């Protein structure tokens, strides 16, 4: 959190004085952004494994239990500076792993001896706030912490009761959070971190005044972390007014991952016919290594059982499994002793296998951002790959959305697909 001099450390005895906005220390940043549309990264350090982040053992256990294998690009860059206490601006799209980035960082910085809100997370919508709460609770599963979602549309009395119990992490929407701080129900005396997720969305929804008011009610020493897909003028103003010498991290969208990957679809009239379609595909092509994605853990288990019953050798992996079990499966898959892996989206980003020649979306992903994480497996390291999507009548709209979003074309699978893999 910034003081008038912008870059100086704040003396301890000022830690409870409310925030005063700075002068426009970021005019150079603003000019640079206006010419490029992107912030300029000023931090290059990369930590490429969760083990190397020096996380608390119970937090590390939660990270692996949640299903993460290795950190995504933003997690490799942003977790360490946030943990060290720097103000951080991260420009990143959804689907890059940013929720886990600030959740892990916030959990690491919690003091177990202090009861009360130490991390406050703002989100533009109730749904996103609830989603973030679930991630924080899941990753913090072994840490004995509580996380409360403070959102509009719920009973104020219940909110007040939950906040009175002193949850260590509070995630909410600007209106309700501001109301609770003003009522002194949400106490900020112990607050260490203020995290704004999807800042561009929040400001475009007209929350600017409430966000500025919240800043005024926080201790001067509060660390500020801001995440935004775009950096319009109103977001830049927040960064220049309220942040002190921030670390700036730009994570570009992974556009290159679709290059060199042939994308096809097979029209499947009914959901029940997908299994036979997959069996036929097995007969047609010689698979070096393939990953098959389903949308639920239950579907992964069901498909594994069905294929095993038909004498196909497959491995399955999802977040319900113990980490040790998942490690064994990944080791077998990487070494090539297991050739077909059936998995959920949760693990899409952790599967880094060079030999994967084929990705099959048994289910199209529920959101278009996950498409690139699934398909990206096939074309990593400059290798060619093939992606085949099973598409029912209900999926056509999502497939068109994916094509539009990535400016790509998914064509009907040709008869000679075996020659392409």
Swiss-Prot record:
GO molecular-function term, one example from the UniProt record: RNA helicase activity
Residue stretches of biased makeup (Polar residues): 13-26
EC assignment: 3.6.4.13
Domain Helicase ATP-binding: from-to ranges: 79-249
Single GO biological process annotation from the record: cytoplasmic translational initiation
Cellular component terms (Gene Ontology): cytoplasm
SUPFAM superfamilies linked to this entry: P-loop containing nucleoside triphosphate hydrolases (SSF52540)
S-S pairs: none
PROSITE patterns: DEAD_ATP_HELICASE, HELICASE_ATP_BIND_1, HELICASE_CTER, Q_MOTIF
Region of interest (Disordered), ranges: 1-26
Domain Helicase C-terminal residue range list: 260-421
Sequence motif DEAD box, location on chain: 197-200
Catalytic activity: ATP + H2O = ADP + phosphate + H(+)
Keywords, sorted A to Z: ATP-binding, Cytoplasm, Helicase, Hydrolase, Initiation factor, Nucleotide-binding, Protein biosynthesis, RNA-binding
Compartments reported by the entry: Cytoplasm
Domain of life, source organism: Eukaryota
Location of the motif Q motif: 48-76
Stated role: ATP-dependent RNA helicase which is a subunit of the eIF4F complex involved in cap recognition and is required for mRNA binding to ribosome. In the current model of translation initiation, eIF4A unwinds RNA secondary structures in the 5'-UTR of mRNAs which is necessary to allow efficient binding of the small ribosomal subunit, and subsequent scanning for the initiator codon.
Comment on protein domains: The Q motif is unique to and characteristic of the DEAD box family of RNA helicases and controls ATP binding and hydrolysis.
Family: Belongs to the DEAD box helicase family. eIF4A subfamily.
Subunit structure of this chain's protein: Component of the eIF4F complex, which composition varies with external and internal environmental conditions. It is composed of at least eIF4A, eIF4E and eIF4G.
Protein name (database record): ATP-dependent RNA helicase eIF4A
Source organism: Aspergillus oryzae (strain ATCC 42149 / RIB 40)
Higher taxonomy: Eukaryota, Fungi, Dikarya, Ascomycota, Pezizomycotina
Gene that this polypeptide is encoded by: tif1
């Amino acid at each position: 959190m910034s003081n008038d001099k912008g870059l100086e450390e704040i003396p301890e005895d000022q830690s409870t004085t409310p925030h005063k906005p700075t002068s426009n220390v970021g005019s150079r940043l603003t000019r640079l952004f206006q010419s490029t549309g992107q912030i300029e990264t000023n931090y290059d350090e990369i930590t490429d494994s969760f083990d190397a982040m020096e996380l608390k053992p119970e937090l590390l256990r939660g990270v692996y239990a949640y299903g993460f294998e290795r950190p995504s690009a933003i997690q490799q860059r942003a977790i360490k500076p946030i943990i060290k206490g720097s103000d951080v601006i991260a420009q990143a799209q959804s689907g890059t792993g940013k929720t886990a980035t600030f959740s892990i960082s916030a959990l690491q910085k919690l003091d177990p001896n202090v009861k009360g809100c130490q991390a406050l997370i703002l989100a533009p919508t109730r749904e996103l706030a609830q989603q973030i709460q679930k991630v924080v609770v899941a990753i913090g599963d072994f840490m004995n912490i509580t996380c409360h979602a403070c959102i509009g549309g719920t009973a104020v009395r219940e909110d007040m009761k939950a906040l009175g119990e002193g949850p260590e992490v509070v995630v909410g929407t600007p209106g309700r959070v501001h109301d609770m701080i003003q009522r002194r129900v949400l106490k900020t005396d112990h607050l260490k971190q203020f995290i704004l997720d999807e800042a561009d969305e929040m400001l475009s929804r007209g929350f600017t005044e409430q966000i500025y008011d919240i800043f005024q009610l926080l201790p001067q020493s509060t660390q500020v972390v801001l995440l935004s897909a775009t950096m319009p003028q109103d977001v830049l103003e927040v960064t220049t007014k309220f942040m002190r010498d921030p670390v700036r991290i730009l994570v570009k969208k992974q556009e290159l991952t679709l290059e060199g990957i042939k994308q096809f679809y097979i029209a499947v009239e009914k959901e029940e016919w997908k299994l036979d379609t997959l069996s036929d595909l097995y007969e047609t092509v010689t698979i070096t290594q393939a990953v098959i994605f389903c949308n639920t853990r239950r579907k992964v288990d069901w498909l594994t059982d069905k294929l095993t019953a038909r004498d196909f050798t497959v491995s399955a992996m999802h977040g319900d499994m113990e980490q040790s079990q998942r490690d064994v499966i990944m080791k077998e898959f990487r070494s090539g002793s297991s050739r077909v892996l059936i998995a959920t989206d949760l693990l899409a980003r952790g599967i880094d296998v060079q030999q994967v020649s084929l990705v099959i979306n048994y289910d199209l992903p529920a959101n278009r951002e996950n498409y690139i994480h699934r398909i990206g497996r096939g074309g990593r390291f400059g290798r060619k790959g093939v992606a085949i999507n099973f598409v029912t009548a209900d999926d056509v709209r999502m497939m068109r959305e994916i094509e539009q979003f990535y400016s790509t074309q998914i064509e009907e699978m040709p008869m000679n697909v075996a020659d392409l893999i």
